């Protein structure tokens, strides 16, 4: 071997370059994603489009599904111009039958589905507990929660059928880990998405389907304008109060000051390579989470001191 390079060292160097070379600042195994297909709801803009671009850069086929046809067409052309194999399909995530159609079209175009990114979501109504109305709650539940349920229900069998494994990526929020006052519906649905994701990890492990949940804080998207896609059946006859409008305006300003959406897609790819379950985009929120976990730990400690629970302290935990 020239320059004193041993055969073993050369092999190790080759493996290192294959599995850890730099691509857009991230470590990438090209074979992990290349030629496979991802279905992304809410893929026409914002976080969904950012993820579509990042996966496209890894040579994946992408199916972008969105309720906004105009944005969908624009996003499709943008991805095509970047050399990404793309299929654009209109989708209302709250309708299971439309998810079925997306799955059918994805399989017809690309043959197999390997990943679903349940990204589509709405900000929901803002306001006090007593001011929230049923239609507003139903809108947020149907899109943010049932949209994820339907996406996984339809796409999981398609991922299982080829036996190659795959991914489910659910987009939640830091709000799901620590509640936002006056945004009860949004907070509740994002907490539910995190819990669902935690449930699915153990269920799908045997099928080599990796589950992740993305929990961003404020990102520069148009989630504050999600009202534009609110169908008639979810619209309320009750006018928004001035204080509710003020809360919505404040939230909008926070979103506009958020991080660049392009970072999020790249971060998702980085996290999937490392098989991360919780995917965070705002490490500066760690201290807030530590406050919560400390409070939980303290509550457990107090329960251990309760005379009512003394016989339970040493009981073994039985899992199903």
List each language-model region with its residue ranges.
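Substrate-binding pocket helix/loop in short-chain dehydrogenase/reductase
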Residues: 127-129, 133-138
